[in-house]
Amino acid sequence: MPHVITQSCCNDASCVFACPVNCIHPTPDEPGFATSEMLYIDPVACVDCGACVTACPVSAIAPNTRLDFEQLPFVEINASYYPKRPAGVKLAPTSKLAPVTPAAEVRVRRQPLTVAVVGSGPAAMYAADELLVQQGVQVNVFEKLPTPYGLVRSGVAPDHQNTKRVTRLFDRIAGHRRFRFYLNVEIGKHLGHAELLAHHHAVLYAVGAPDDRRLTIDGMGLPGTGTATELVAWLNGHPDFNDLPVDLSHERVVIIGNGNVALDVARVLAADPHELAATDIADHALSALRNSAVREVVVAARRGPAHSAFTLPELIGLTAGADVVLDPGDHQRVLDDLAIVADPLTRNKLEILSTLGDGSAPARRVGRPRIRLAYRLTPRRVLGQRRAGGVQFSVTGTDELRQLDAGLVLTSIGYRGKPIPDLPFDEQAALVPNDGGRVIDPGTGEPVPGAYVAGWIKRGPTGFIGTNKSCSMQTVQALVADFNDGRLTDPVATPTALDQLVQARQPQAIGCAGWRAIDAAEIARGSADGRVRNKFTDVAEMLAAATSAPKEPLRRRVLARLRDLGQPIVLTVPL
């Protein structure tokens, strides 16, 4: 009964290190790890111990006998990653474990290491976790929104609740006694980089890539145009996108680009609102989908089927739950690519695409929109005068023009980082120049003292949620090495002074207790309607919920004050 990794794999590799026989690959030290779409369990080497199940933060692993029908393709996907061996042959258990990168060891100094982390998404939380392994390290996480966890909260599709379970791990990290949240505090507005450095040894920026790459064709910007990432944020109740004008009163939506985000949007637009009602989808989005007139979602790509940007797990998830079709011309392109492509992963995608119909057969899901995957279409302009009415494409590599009428046109062509005040920025690469996480002055090539980056702002928008774990670990290793070598300046202000500064600049800052109050209130609201949670989508509502949080215990406040004063802390234990 070997175990199987399924669609929601986040690539954080906790399962790799939990496995006693090293049967999960690629491991973080292997070349393919950074670009792998998921991790894979070797069914021949697996000893069925289940250690990986409890280690996985997103519940992506199960015995092969407990898979849902839609998950069955992952049995072969896991197995096909490994060489073919005779059926029934079981490998002997091995004592060779995946190599573990040791945690960065912080040397004791007069002042314990104190780090500010800007951002609260996966890269930020994994960095905090790595730092808190060491005794005495204090981590303060700053987030401009009243709620943490970045794209896990606002960028993962509502119907991917397993993926969102990684927030349980993040909540455990945030519960550490040397961890503090400063939510609803924007760096660059309420506090500056220099002020953070005055209160910390180092500042680690894990702010992601918050902007979209824009498609510069005529008509983009008309009402009825937007980006897929904006729509996902709207679906998830991000307060900055509450009022996003999403017009679903027309029969067709066109999405330009065919990565995973494009598939997420197509899948949700075609989903049954009754099924979505059990998720954490925002109320305004659920209402709009219930009244949607959309009958078709077209996902258009410039290149051919062999160059599809979506991952194999996402394609499997899409075709398992929606009516997905290809035009006859695109079906022939799939067959042509199958005849020449050798890469196993690409062939797996093409084989699934080759099974899709052309839409002439009766719909599998009566009354639901169908999804059409279209290839070799290069967008030329958005049609319409006062609002979008469709898209004009050319067939890639030719002068042939094609037109698709649509009432909503979305682009999904990638994310882009944006400049951070007081730090250098590479406009072309859209990231902060760095060497292994150390921010580098591009003029001199020298490190910027006390400044570090992790996640997408460090490496660009690549990888998956768990990819940020190894990325953040590398940055923390560099930061700790600099601290140990005396290259980081001790903070000149006390923790209490930081609290006072934050309170003066942003009286509505929210701490860990406030976040727990918001979280509990959302879960309670959802529970009343049989939902995972019912999110607050307005900042004022979040702030009101946060005020119900209990005050920090007097004992903890006294201990914090004694630490500020440098007084010894003596605990009396009754005999």
From Swiss-Prot:
Residues 115-575 are annotated as: Ferredoxin--NADP reductase. InterPro entries: 4Fe4S_Fe-S-bd, 4Fe4S_Fe_S_CS, FAD/NAD-bd_sf, FAD/NAD-binding_dom, Ferredox_Rdtase. It catalyses: 2 reduced [2Fe-2S]-[ferredoxin] + NADP(+) + H(+) = 2 oxidized [2Fe-2S]-[ferredoxin] + NADPH. [4Fe-4S] cluster 1 binds at residues 9, 15, 19. The keyword Electron transport applies. GO terms for molecular function: 4 iron, 4 sulfur cluster binding; ferredoxin-NADP+ reductase activity; metal ion binding; oxidoreductase activity. Gene3D superfamilies: 3.30.70.20, FAD/NAD(P)-binding domain, NAD(P)-binding Rossmann-like Domain. PANTHER family: GLUTAMATE SYNTHASE 1 [NADH], CHLOROPLASTIC-LIKE (PTHR48467:SF1). This is Probable ferredoxin/ferredoxin--NADP reductase. It comes from Mycobacterium tuberculosis (strain ATCC 25618 / H37Rv). The lineage of its organism: Bacteria, Bacillati, Actinomycetota, Actinomycetes, Mycobacteriales.
